[in-house]
């Protein structure tokens, strides 16, 4: 987040297993103080129960990927890719919903009134006098690469296992 009173910006990183405030954690505390003034509830790791199971889910996807690589079955690749896409979509929707509830459940007794808003999941948004930026980190790119590799492997395996086309000889009728 950037604002005139914070020229260096205030940073918060959300990982699969933890929240980290920039500046040694002080930025998360600063964000929570600012949130208090607009009536938004505090951002705490305890409020994100998915942080407890996402690391295990990612480990499971890694193990399933290894199993699929060893046995190289097309149906296993399809199953793994579909499951991984569902997991990714569910995670994005859950994160968007979490951002929506944080920005729309504002206390009416707040010191500063701002209209309800949804912090950006990706991209930029101007909220009050802040420019809020939200961009994926390395983990998102690695997970996207994992899905891309699964998709490429699926295409390769499907082509390899497809029966060869038999040429048809046409005989002209006499």
Predicted regions, residues:
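Alpha-helical transmembrane segments of secretory-pathway, organelle, and plasma-membrane proteins
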Residues: 1-8, 83, 87-89, 94, ...
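Terminal transmembrane helical module of multi-pass membrane proteins
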Residues: 104-174
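Structural signature of transmembrane alpha-helix termini at the membrane-water interface
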Residues: 66-70, 93-100, 152-162
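Interfacial segments of alpha-helical transmembrane regions
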Residues: 65-91, 166-167
